[in-house]
Amino acid sequence: MSDNAHNLLYDKFELPEAVKMLPVEGLPIDKHARFIAEPLERGMGHTLGNALRRALLIGLEAPAIISFAMTGVLHEYMAIEGVIEDVTNIILNLKGALLKKYPMQDSSLGRTTQVLKASISIDASDLAAANGQKEVTLQDLLQEGDFEAVNPDQVIFTVTQPIQLEVVLRIAFGRGYTPSERIVLEDKGVYEIVLDAAFSPVTLVNYFVEDTRVGQDTDFDRLVLIVETDGRVTPKEALAFSTQILTKHFSIFENMDEKKIVFEEAISIEKENKDDILHKLILGINEIELSVRSTNCLSNANIETIGELVIMPEPRLLQFRNFGKKSLCEIKNKLKEMKLELGMDLTQFGVGLDNVKEKMKWYAEKIRAKNIKG
């Protein structure tokens, strides 16, 4: 017996062909985007939306400043001569630093914590050129290393007199948000001040689920996911990374049973000649081999042709009087033999639930006339 004989055969799941990315009105798409996935089976919108939201908010890594030291700074509650901001405000400004750098697998640095030193030297001419107040920005502090600042013009402190000092930054990689009391530095300097670290590049994730349709069946989900980032990653990158994180975690549950599930594929009209499909759709119900019970059920529901049958969603068929799961199973198997299925989208033939009976008659007459002429 082949390995495939042990596989379980499941009915197909409706899945989107692709995820659409759209801008959020009035906002730049490199930081704000809307993603739409449809159709999804009922309930899968919330299942995927909630999982992706959590992974986006807590799973993505980015660098952040976790500590700093500065010449003459003994603690965070002091003022510095010749500097407008006190140390508390300098800390707040450092927390607003948005750093980019992704450790590559083949990089010698990897994910190690890095210490960057910057020498700041401001003389009278610098002050004169700046009207007496020289701003020191984030870019001025990134003299070493290969970190890129998304907001390089972020002001860290402002100098009002000639000064020479050294600023030391310790930068680490992490996820989410880590308060300073949870950051442990083994080689912490005596006057090194540890900061709260906001690692996550994702600032906001919202999602909602709407109804959508497949053919005439509206019992499907449309997932709308709104992602906002701080610019260190794009929303598209963030969604791709979070999906990989979830896939990694789901994989640990995959091999709990030797049996595998094989999903049936949806019927695609494009794969078959349209004329062949039409010849099947105009067939009368009495022209295919169904049990008397199933035939009578369809007749009582005023379903006369295969076209009228296949356009019906499965739940709607079950609403007809005396139509049970046994008849449903028989009909689905018969349609499968014909390479058809319930709930088919016949819009490319101009056929909907509101006109299917008339359209089937029109197509039958058209094909009959063509055969006579031929």
From Swiss-Prot:
Checking SMART domains in the record gives: RPOLD (SM00662)
This protein's record includes keyword Nucleotide-binding: no
Q: What class of enzyme is it?
A: transferase
Mention one GO molecular function.
Answer: protein dimerization activity
Give the Enzyme Commission number: 2.7.7.6
Q: Where is this region: Alpha C-terminal domain (alpha-CTD)?
A: 274-374
Listed under catalytic activity are: RNA(n) + a ribonucleoside 5'-triphosphate = RNA(n+1) + diphosphate
Region of interest called Alpha N-terminal domain (alpha-NTD), as start-end residue ranges on this chain: 1-257
**Keyword annotations:** DNA-directed RNA polymerase, Nucleotidyltransferase, Transcription, Transferase
InterPro entries (UniProt xref): DNA-dir_RNA_pol_insert (IPR011262), DNA-dir_RNA_pol_RpoA/D/Rpb3 (IPR011263), DNA-dir_RpoA (IPR011773), RBP11-like (IPR036603), RNAP_asu_C (IPR011260), RNApol_insert_sf (IPR036643)
Q: Which GO terms describe its cellular component?
A: cytoplasm; DNA-directed RNA polymerase complex
A GO BP term, please?
DNA-templated transcription
Q: What does this protein do?
A: DNA-dependent RNA polymerase catalyzes the transcription of DNA into RNA using the four ribonucleoside triphosphates as substrates.
**Entry's family note:** Belongs to the RNA polymerase alpha chain family.
- Free-text domain note: The N-terminal domain is essential for RNAP assembly and basal transcription, whereas the C-terminal domain is involved in interaction with transcriptional regulators and with upstream promoter elements.
Protein name in UniProt: DNA-directed RNA polymerase subunit alpha
